[in-house]
C-alpha cells in the first residue's frame, strides 16, 4: 500500500473514531476505540473477537493479498508506518478506520513496528477461500515481539537476539535467557539488583518479560528502555506459577524431573525459565523443538564488567558513533561465519576467570599458528558455510524454503574436509571440537538426493524435487510435458481450420487456457468458439476440446505441485529431527572459527601468548593499545610497561598533562588483561596476567541529561558502584576522580577513594589512578602499595612534545597553558594566562598539604603552577579570628583528611565574608 502522510480527512476520521461513544453493548478494542458489536458485519465481528484476545498487539488481519488493520490499530499503524489511512464499511454508520500492507512485504512493516516496541499478532487465512463455506477461517499463527522476531533480514547476523525472563522473589532474582533464532537457552540466579543489571548489560536482550515484583525491585526499568533500548513487558502472575512452570519445562524437555537437566536446585531460575517457555509457546504457536536444551550457568564464572566499563573500554562498539569499527571486537573479528562472529562477541563480553579454561584456548591458538597453512585452509573451508544455527531454527519452525535446504547441504559438505585437517592437531580444545563436529553425511545425502540443485524460492510452485526421487512426481511431470505438446498441436490445427495465422493459446491463473484472436481476425472466429474474455485489442475464446485438455493438464500440474510440497515438507521435517546433532556441530564450527580468527589476528599484529597466573601479578612489557595501534596510519605506537601486584605495587597514581596519553595507557592495560582472559594473544613483548574477577573503569565525564544527572553525579554514582563491588582480585581504571566539583571537594574525594582502595580489608584492588591533583603524589610512601608514575614530556621553549612514555615519579607541571596553545586558543588568552600563572605561583597549596601529612620519605619531585582554586588562604585575608583558629591547630595530631576538611571550612568562611 502506498506510503504517504495522512490527509486532513483521514485524520478527522481517526479523531472521530477515538471520540465516538456508542450507547449499545460495546467491546473495547485496544486503547480506547469502542465498537458497537451488535451492528458490525460478520467479518468485522470475527475481527473484534480476535482483537479482544490479542488486545496488547497490533493485529495484522489477512484479507486476500493484504494484511489489514482496523480501528485503533489502523490509527497507530498508519502513523508509525506512514501509510495511508482509509475506511471500510463495517455495518455501522461510520466507516471503520483501516490501513493495510501487502502480504509479500509484511516482514518489513512488522519489523518497523517491532523496533518501535510494539507487538504484532499475525492472523492468517487457514483454509482455502475456494473451499470455505461462509467466512474464511482465520487464526493467529504467530505473535512477533522484539525478542521473538525470526526475520533474518532485520537481525544482525553477528549478534544474538536475546529474550530475557526475570522473576523477582524476595531478595533474589531468577533469570532465563534465550535466542530463538539459534536455540540457545540459559538460566541463572542472582542475589542483588546490581548483579542482575550486570547480566542485563552483558546480554543486552531485545526484550525482557518479568513479574510485577521486578518493576519494584530497584532496577531502573526506564533506564533499560532509554539507554539500552530494551522493551520490558510485565506478564500476568499465572505465568510465574511454580507448579505450572515446572510442568511446562518437564513437558518441553520430556523429562520426569528437572534434576536430569541439571537445574533442579535453581528454584527461581526454574520459574523464570518456565515463564519464558510459556511465553514462547503462546507467541510462536509451535513446539520449539530446536530449543532442545537449557544450560545453567553461574555469573561468578565470568569476569564482571559493568555497563560503564563496557562502554568506556569500547568492547563491541565505539562510545560516540556506536559502530563496530574502532572497538576491540573490530580488531579481533576476522571470523568467516555468522556463528563464529556471534561466538566471538560472547567471548569478548564474557571473559573467563578459570585459568585452566583460558590456557586451553591459548593452547588452541598457539597450535593453529604453529601450523599456519592448516589454519588458513580451515578458514577457506569455513568461508562458504552458512548460518547453521539459524538455518536449523527456520527448519524447525517449518519456515525454511527449498533454497535454505540446498544452502544447508552445501555447508555440511565442507565439514569432512575440516575434520580431516583437524585430525592432525593435538591441543585438547581442537581435539574436542573435532569430536563434536559431526559430518552429518546422512543429512547431506538426503538433501542432495531429493532436492534439485537450483530450486525455486517458493515452496508451492513446483520444481523442487529431483528427478528420480519419486515415481509419481516423474509421472506428473511427463503429463505436464506431454500437455504442452498437445497444446502446441491443438494451436496448429486451429490455425489451419480457421485460417487465423496469429491465433495463439494463452494461459493465466484466473481464466486458465484460451484461444486468443486479435480484433483484426475476429470475423473469422468459428461458431463453436465460446467468448471467455475481452481485451483491448483481442478476444479470448474456449472450445470443448481445449477445456478437456485444460482439465487434464492443470489437474496433473496441481497434483504435481501438491505432491512436491508434501515431499519437501517431509524432507524438511527429517532434517529438523536431527536438531541436536546439528546444533552441537554448529557450536563446534563456531568455536573453531573464533580460534582461527584470533590466531590469525595474533600472527598479523605480533601479539604474544600471555602467561596466566593466579597470584595477582600483572606484568606487561611493552604493551600496546590493540585498537589505537590499528587506527593510527603513519605514526608508530609507543609501547609501555605495566606492573601491578597484590603487595607493594597495587596502586599506580599517574600524573601528566591532558593529551599526553594517560587514558590510552590505562585502557590498554585493561584491554590486554581482558584479551588474555578471553583466551587471546595480546599486544605486548611479554605479558604475565593474574586473573582478575572484575574490571571497573571510571573514565571521562558526561552529563546524563535523560535522567537529570550532572557530570559529577554520574561520576560519583560510578565511583560508588566500584567501591561497593570491587574486590582484591579486581582491576580498577580511574581517571580524574573528583574533577567534576570544586578543587577541595574533588581532592578530598580522590584522596579518600585512594585510601579506601589501598585498605586491603576494605578493597585492596589493583588500580591505575590518573589525576591532575598533584597533591595525591604525597601518598606514595604513606599508603601501602601506592606508587607514582607520570607521562614523560619534553619541553622546547614554550612548546612541549608528548613522549607517550610512562616513567617513575610524579609530574612537576600541569602544562595546561601549553596544551591550550596546541588546541588553538588565541595568543592573547595564552599570554594573559602566562601572566596570571606567575602571579599565582606563590599560592601553592601543595606546601600546605605537605605540612598536613605525617612525616614521610623525601619526595623526588616538587610541583607548581596550580589553578585559581589553589591560592594561599593568607594572601588577602587579615581576619584575626581565622588567624587565631589556625594558630590553635595541633597540626601534628591531624590526619590528612582532617586537615583538608579544616582548610575547606576556612575557605568557606572567607568566601562568605567576601
Residue ranges and their predicted role:
Residues 1-39, 826, 830-914:
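Acidic, low-complexity intrinsically disordered tails
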Residues 2-367, 376, 383-396, 400-492, ...:
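Charged catalytic and DNA/RNA-contacting regions of genome-maintenance
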Residues 40-44, 60, 71, 100-110, ...:
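Amphipathic alpha-helical transducer elements in NTP-driven molecular machines
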Residues 71-74, 266, 336, 344-347, ...:
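ATPase nucleotide-binding head domains, primarily ABC-like/P-loop NTPase cores
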Residues 123, 146-155, 287, 423-429, ...:
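Active-site phosphate-binding and catalytic loops of NTP-dependent enzymes
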Residues 205-213, 219-222, 234, 545-578, ...:
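Conserved catalytic alpha/beta cores of large enzymes that bind or transform nucleotide phosphates
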Residues 240-248, 252-255, 303-307, 315, ...:
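Amphipathic heptad-repeat alpha-helical coiled-coil/stalk segments that mediate oligomerization
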Residues 397, 401, 411-414, 467-468, ...:
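Charged, surface-exposed helical/loop "interaction arms" that form contiguous linear patches used
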Amino acid at each position: 500500500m502506498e506510503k504517504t502522510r495522512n490527509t486532513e480527512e483521514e485524520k478527522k476520521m481517526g479523531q472521530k473514531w477515538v471520540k465516538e461513544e456508542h450507547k449499545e453493548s460495546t467491546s473495547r478494542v485496544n486503547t480506547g476505540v469502542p465498537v458497537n458489536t451488535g451492528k458490525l458485519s460478520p467479518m468485522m465481528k470475527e475481527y473484534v473477537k480476535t482483537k479482544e484476545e490479542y488486545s496488547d498487539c497490533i493485529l495484522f488481519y489477512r484479507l486476500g493479498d493484504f494484511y489489514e488493520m482496523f480501528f485503533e490499530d489502523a490509527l497507530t499503524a498508519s502513523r508509525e508506518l506512514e501509510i495511508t489511512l482509509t475506511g471500510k464499511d463495517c455495518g455501522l454508520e461510520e466507516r471503520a478506520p483501516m490501513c493495510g500492507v501487502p502480504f509479500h512485504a509484511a516482514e518489513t512493516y512488522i519489523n518497523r513496528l517491532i523496533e518501535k516496541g510494539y507487538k504484532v499478532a499475525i492472523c492468517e487465512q487457514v483454509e482455502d477461500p475456494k473451499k470455505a463455506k461462509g467466512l474464511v477461517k482465520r487464526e493467529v499463527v504467530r505473535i512477533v515481539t522484539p525478542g521473538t522476531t525470526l526475520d533474518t533480514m532485520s537481525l544482525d547476523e553477528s549478534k544474538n537476539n536475546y529474550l530475557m525472563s526475570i522473576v523477582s522473589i524476595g531478595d533474589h532474582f531468577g533469570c532465563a535467557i534465550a535466542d530463538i533464532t539459534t536455540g540457545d537457552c540459559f538460566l541463572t540466579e542472582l542475589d542483588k539488583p546490581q548483579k542482575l543489571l550486570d547480566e542485563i548489560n552483558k546480554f543486552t536482550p531485545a526484550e525482557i518479560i518479568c513479574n510485577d515484583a521486578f518493576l519494584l525491585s530497584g532496577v531502573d526499568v526506564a533506564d533499560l528502555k532509554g539507554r539500552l533500548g530494551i522493551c520490558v513487558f510485565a506478564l500476568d502472575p499465572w505465568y510465574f506459577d511454580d507448579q505450572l512452570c515446572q510442568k511446562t519445562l518437564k513437558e518441553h524437555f520430556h523429562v520426569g524431573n528437572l534434576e536430569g537437566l541439571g537445574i533442579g536446585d535453581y528454584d527461581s531460575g526454574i520459574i523464570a525459565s518456565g515463564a519464558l517457555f510459556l511465553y514462547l509457546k503462546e507467541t510462536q504457536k509451535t513446539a520449539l523443538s530446536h530449543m532442545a536444551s537449557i544450560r545453567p550457568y553461574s555469573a561468578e564464572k565470568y569476569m564482571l564488567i559493568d555497563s560503564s566499563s563496557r562502554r568506556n573500554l569500547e568492547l563491541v562498539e565505539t562510545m560516540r558513533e556506536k559502530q563496530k569499527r574502532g572497538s576491540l571486537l573490530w580488531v579481533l573479528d576476522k571470523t568467516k561465519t555468522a556463528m563464529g562472529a556471534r561466538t566471538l562477541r560472547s567471548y569478548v563480553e564474557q571473559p573467563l576467570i578459570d585459568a585452566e579454561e583460558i590456557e586451553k584456548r591459548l593452547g588452541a591458538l598457539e597450535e593453529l599458528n604453529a601450523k599456519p597453512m592448516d589454519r588458513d585452509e580451515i578458514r577457506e573451508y569455513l568461508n562458504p558455510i552458512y548460518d547453521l544455527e539459524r538455518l536449523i531454527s527456520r527448519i524447525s519452525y517449518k519456515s525454511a524454503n527449498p533454497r535454505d535446504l540446498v544452502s544447508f547441504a552445501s555447508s555440511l559438505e565442507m565439514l569432512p574436509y575440516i575434520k580431516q585437517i583437524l585430525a592432525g592437531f593435538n591441543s585438547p580444545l581442537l581435539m574436542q571440537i573435532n569430536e563434536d563436529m559431526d559430518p552429518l553425511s546422512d543429512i547431506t545425502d538426503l538433501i542432495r538426493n531429493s532436492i534439485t540443485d537450483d530450486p525455486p524460492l517458493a515452496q508451492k510452485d513446483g520444481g523442487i524435487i529431483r528427478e528420480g526421487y519419486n515415481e509419481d512426481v516423474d509421472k506428473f511431470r511427463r503429463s505436464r510435458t506431454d500437455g504442452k505438446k498437445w497444446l502446441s498441436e491443438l494451436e496448429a490445427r486451429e490455425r489451419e481450420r480457421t485460417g487465423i495465422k496469429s491465433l495463439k493459446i494463452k494461459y493465466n491463473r484466473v481464466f486458465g487456457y484460451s484461444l486468443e484472436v486479435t480484433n483484426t481476425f475476429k470475423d473469422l472466429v468459428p461458431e463453436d468458439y465460446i467468448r471467455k474474455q475481452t481485451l483491448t485489442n483481442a478476444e479470448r475464446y474456449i472450445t470443448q476440446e481445449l477445456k478437456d485438455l485444460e482439465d487434464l493438464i492443470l489437474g496433473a500440474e496441481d497434483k504435481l505441485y501438491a505432491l512436491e510440497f508434501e515431499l519437501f515438507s517431509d524432507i524438511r521435517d527429517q532434517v529438523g529431527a536431527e536438531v541436536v546433532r546439528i546444533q552441537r556441530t554448529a557450536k563446534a564450527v563456531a568455536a573453531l572459527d573464533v580460534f582461527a580468527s584470533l590466531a590469525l589476528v595474533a600472527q598479523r599484529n605480533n601479539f604474544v601468548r600471555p602467561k596466566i597466573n593466579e597470584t595477582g601479578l600483572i606484568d606487561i612489557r611493552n604493551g600496546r593499545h590493540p585498537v589505537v595501534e590499528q587506527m593510527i596510519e603513519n605514526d608508530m605506537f609507543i609501547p609501555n610497561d605495566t606492573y601491578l601486584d597484590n603487595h607493594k605495587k597495587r596502586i599506580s597514581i599517574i600524573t601528566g598533562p591532558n593529551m599526553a596519553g594517560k587514558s590510552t595507557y590505562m585502557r590498554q592495560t585493561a584491554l590486554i588483561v581482558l584479551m588474555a582472559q578471553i583466551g587471546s594473544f595480546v599486544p605486548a613483548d611479554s605479558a604475565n596476567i593474574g586473573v582478575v574477577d572484575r574490571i571497573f573503569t571510571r573514565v571521562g565525564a558526561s552529563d546524563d541529561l535523560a535522567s537529570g544527572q550532572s557530570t559529577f553525579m554520574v561520576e560519583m554514582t560510578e565511583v560508588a558502584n566500584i567501591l561497593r563491588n570491587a574486590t582484591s582480585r579486581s582491576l580498577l581504571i580511574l581517571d580524574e576522580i573528583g574533577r567534576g566539583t570544586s578543587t577541595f571537594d574533588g581532592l578530598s574525594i580522590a584522596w579518600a577513594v585512594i585510601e579506601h582502595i589501598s585498605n586491603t580489608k576494605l578493597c585492596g584492588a589493583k588500580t591505575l589512578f590518573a589525576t591532575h591533583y598533584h597533591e595525591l603524589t604525597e601518598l606514595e610512601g604513606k599508603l601501602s602499595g601506592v606508587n607514582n608514575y607520570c607521562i614523560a614530556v619534553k619541553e622546547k621553549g614554550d612548546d612541549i612534545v608528548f613522549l607517550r612514555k610512562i616513567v617513575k615519579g610524579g609530574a612537576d607541571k600541569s602544562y595546561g597553558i601549553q596544551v591550550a596553545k596546541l588546541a588553538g586558543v588565541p595568543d592573547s588568552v595564552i599570554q594573559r594566562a602566562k601572566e596570571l600563572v606567575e602571579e599565582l605561583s606563590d599560592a601553592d597549596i601543595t606546601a600546605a598539604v605537605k605540612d598536613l601529612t605525617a612525616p614521610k620519605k623525601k619526595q623526588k619531585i616538587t610541583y607548581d603552577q596550580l589553578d585559581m582554586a589553589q591560592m594561599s588562604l593568607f594572601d588577602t585575608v587579615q581576619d584575626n579570628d581565622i588567624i587565631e583558629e589556625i594558630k590553635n591547630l595541633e597540626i601534628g595530631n591531624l590526619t590528612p583528611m582532617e586537615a583538608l576538611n579544616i582548610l575547606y571550612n576556612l575557605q568557606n568562611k572567607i568566601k562568605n565574608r567576601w
